[in-house]
Design a protein with these regions (language model features):
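Conserved loop->alpha-helix
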Residues: 1-100
Length: 100
């Protein structure tokens, strides 16, 4: 995990959920303008207060993958397509990129 402070930087909609054999994929809209640079593959992000790793980044969306245990023990099991989620960007990434 990474440091999660509970600050909400923005919200974004969930656009797709895919159930795989032992995990779930959650696809979110990426519409953060200048903050898009904080979303990188294998980087950290907090969604609804949960520390997660970004699995894939595309031009207008990003995806995280969660194992069944994470799905069943977090609020992710209640999410539905079009739900708005709270996003907190990784503080260390933000600090480094803002001080280049």
């Amino acid at each position: 995990g990474h440091f999660v402070y509970g600050h909400i930087d923005c919200v974004t909609p969930l656009i797709k959920i895919i159930k795989l054999e032992n995990s779930w994929e959650f696809h979110f809209e990426k519409k953060f303008n200048k903050n898009n640079r904080f979303i990188v593959e294998k980087g950290s992000i907090s969604i609804n207060g949960i520390s997660l790793t970004v699995a894939k980044v595309e031009n207008k969306k990003f995806m995280i993958s969660v194992i069944d245990h994470t799905f069943n023990h977090t609020n992710f099991k209640y999410l539905k397509k079009s739900d708005q989620v709270n996003i907190e960007f990784d503080y260390l990434a933000r600090f480094i990129l803002n001080n280049e």
